[in-house]
C-alpha cells in the first residue's frame, strides 16, 4: 500500500498533543482596530481542535 501524504498546510497549522490537536485562534491577523482590547486578548494563545473536526485533522496529518 502506498504511503499517505500529509497536507502540508494543515501540518503547519496543527500540533499534536496527548489529548488531540491544538490550533491558533482565528480573527487575529488584521482589521483589529474595530475589535475591543478584551476580544483581542481572548484570541491570544492556542485552543484545542473540536471533537467533530478531529477525524478531518487526523486524515490530513496522518504522521503528526
Swiss-Prot record:
Keywords: Ribonucleoprotein, Ribosomal protein. GO terms for biological process: translation. The keyword Ribonucleoprotein applies. One of its GO terms (molecular function) is structural constituent of ribosome. One of its GO terms (cellular component) is cytosolic large ribosomal subunit. SUPFAM superfamilies: L35p-like (SSF143034). The keyword Ribosomal protein applies. It comes from the Bacteria. InterPro entries: Ribosomal_bL35 (IPR001706), Ribosomal_bL35-like (IPR021137), Ribosomal_bL35_CS (IPR018265), Ribosomal_bL35_sf (IPR037229). Pfam families: Ribosomal_L35p (PF01632). NCBIfam families: rpmI_bact. PANTHER family: 54S RIBOSOMAL PROTEIN BL35M, LARGE RIBOSOMAL SUBUNIT PROTEIN BL35M. HAMAP family: Ribosomal_bL35. Belongs to the bacterial ribosomal protein bL35 family. This is Large ribosomal subunit protein bL35. The gene is rpmI.
